[in-house]
Amino acid sequence: GVRLVGSEMCIRDRTVTVMAVTISNASCTLDEYNPSGYTMDALSASVEGYQTILNNVYFGMERALYGYGQFMQMTEGGTDIWTSQKNGDNLYLKYGMGSDFANNMMANTLNCCYDGICYCNQAIVQANKVPFTTEEEKNQKVAEAHFMRAVYYYNLVEQLGGVTLQMSPVEDVDLHPGKDTPLDIYEKCIIPDLEFAVQWLPVEERTTRPSKKSAMGMLARACLQSIEYDSSKKYAQRALEVAKEMVEDCKAGGAALGVYMYDNIEDVFAESNNFENKEALWKHRYVVGGVSNQAWIMNQNNEQFYCPLTAFSAIVFKTDIHSGNKYLSLIHI
């Protein structure tokens, strides 16, 4: 009986060995075929094809940053900068002191940000292969990718500190990536990318796609924020220069850059100015009507923190005695 079992085991071992060798040999001679033909180089053969690559730099932002409730939970949750819906006090457990976030909560945001970063890297590299009419046309397009890469890394650094800096398309999977310091990321990526975007993005008003004033606003913010990691404060002067240029343009009615401020605060939040708000340096319009992939959540972000003003009778509009502008104020009773 023992010899039979032993013989059977030997047969099984040989069978497994033969199968393993067969699979191994097959993998060595496998020719992959892409029936769609949509490779990065194929798309880059035309300006229209390159546009489809460039469109993907915004996907991570829409999916995990601006317009998604989870990012709001991470940035505002556990603070006093919130209020729940009327008769919806259970949101205290979601955004308030009672919140208990999952340990892997950041994973989705992290993945989506790096998804966006990788598409930015692809768009930057592939731009040199596209038959643009002029160098200016190419730079205006690729400036969008530089801007978005800076935005992704700015949010990652300010929420997580040091992260992995990836400035080129990924060739090999690194299972043990290291972390770059926040200042290195600012100096090697965020600030240079925004400087490029400031130089080449158009002045025209746009939605989702950034304009020159979008890049200038982010550049001033990034240069100022870098002081947190740099005791020499070498980018503070640049932040001041950019901010002053924007202030002067605003005083001139936005003649050069489109920087604008409404005379009355009510106009900032007026429904009529919702889609085309002149004060916005960069705006992104949420999907309307409900679609797949839970994009409908985007349309309800305002409700996460919404509470009817009628529930707070002590909040009223007051008028500034100097400017005449109205603002929200609390009446202490």
Please place each PLM-identified region on the residue numbering:
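Single conserved hydrophobic/aromatic residue that forms the stacking wall/gate
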Residues: 1-13, 331-332
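Bacterial Sec-dependent N-terminal signal peptides
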Residues: 7-8, 12-35
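Secondary-structure transition into beta-strands, especially the periplasmic turns and strand N-termini
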Residues: 25, 129-146, 227-245
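An aromatic- and glycine-enriched ligand-binding surface/loop that stacks and positions planar moieties
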Residues: 29-88, 194-196, 212-331
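Short linear capping/connector segments at secondary-structure termini
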Residues: 36-39, 97-101, 167-174
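Conserved, well-structured interaction surfaces
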Residues: 46-65, 87-160, 175-176, 181-188, ...
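Short coil/turn linking the two alpha-helices of tandem helical-hairpin repeats
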Residues: 157-158, 164, 205, 225-232
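Glycine- and aromatic-rich loop/turn segments at beta-sheet edges
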Residues: 164-169, 198-208, 254-265
